Amino acid sequence: MKSQESKAKIVLYIAFIQALIATLGSLFFSEVLHFPPCVLCWYQRICIYPLVIILAVCIIKKDKIVPYLVLPLSLIGLCISIYHNLLYYKIIPESIAPCTTGVSCTTKYIEWFGFITIPLLSLCALSVITVCMILYIRFAGHRRVINKE
């Protein structure tokens, strides 16, 4: 059975790899395939791109505060991604908050296997990163410390 510390290290590496794949994937879609990102995609990118650097630095420095740096960005990105997917799959109408600048947030660029879309890829990436950070907190034994004076 693996120690809690080695489990924490594994989920940290998974989060880093996921953030790296998400970043490279989004750059591939926009720079190589020339798919212009919509407004919501930009907001999700703003949340995902820094995670690669934050996670890499925390892995190198063996910094235990990594979840407290990553979770705010991943949770904000996850909320935006959930909203984007609800719009994309027409669960909520686009008329509630239309994407008026640039490309529509419901534009279909890819649909692998009939259901895997760019917004779904973002949702999965941010979900994996968020779950990894929650598991990291559990495995690394983080406890909330309250200073009593």
PLM region spans:
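Secretory/periplasmic and organellar redox-cofactor proteins
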Residues: 1-40, 48-149
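Phosphate-coordinating loops and pocket residues in cytosolic domains that bind phosphorylated ligands
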Residues: 43
